[in-house]
């Protein structure tokens, strides 16, 4: 049981750190777009690279946040029904629906990993005038899938422990308005 709690705490801490890091990443994204708007509309001097970099940064931000969102209970539920269930019923429903979750994430890991490996092995670059490498952005897909799968495993373990009536207090507790 100690190993399980340590595993849960470790994965929760990793996804919590990634989520917090990404929140600062969003600030950099905002600054980048702000500078581009100023250059484009006030100085009539748009950059070649800002749009493409913004797409890559936001793509990484959006996909890498999945594990953190799962940790804090931010993914979509049918709350009107789900919140009326007891904790054990919610855990049972989550266990049943986790098969779809793991199927999707497994496919994302396998196919995203294949896409990333292909891009990395060819040192793929964009076809734009800026010509940045694309493989760092594509490597975010299997990385995000792995983080999401690991967080899904911790959620699955918590749900099983709830069904068994065990203590599930390992890891950070969700904030106000959030649930695991």
Language-model features, listed with the residues they occupy:
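Alpha-helical transmembrane segments and membrane-interface helix-loop junctions
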Residues: 1-180
């Amino acid at each position: 049981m100690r190993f399980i709690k340590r595993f849960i705490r470790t994965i929760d801490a990793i996804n919590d750190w990634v989520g917090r890091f990404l929140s600062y990443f969003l600030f950099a994204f905002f600054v980048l777009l702000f500078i581009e708007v100023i250059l484009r509309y006030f100085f009539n001097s748009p950059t070649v690279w800002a749009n493409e970099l913004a797409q890559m940064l936001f793509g990484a931000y959006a996909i890498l946040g999945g594990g953190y969102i799962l940790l804090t209970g931010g993914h979509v539920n049918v709350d009107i029904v789900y919140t009326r269930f007891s904790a054990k019923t919610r855990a049972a429903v989550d266990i049943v629906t986790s098969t779809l979750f793991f199927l999707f994430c497994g496919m994302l890991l396998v196919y995203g990993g294949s896409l990333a490996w292909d891009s990395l092995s060819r040192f793929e670059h964009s076809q734009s005038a800026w010509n940045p490498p694309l493989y760092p952005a594509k490597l975010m897909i299997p990385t995000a899938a792995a983080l999401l799968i690991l967080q899904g495993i911790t959620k699955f373990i918590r749900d099983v422990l709830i069904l068994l009536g065990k203590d599930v207090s390992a890891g950070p507790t969700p904030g106000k308005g959030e649930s695991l």
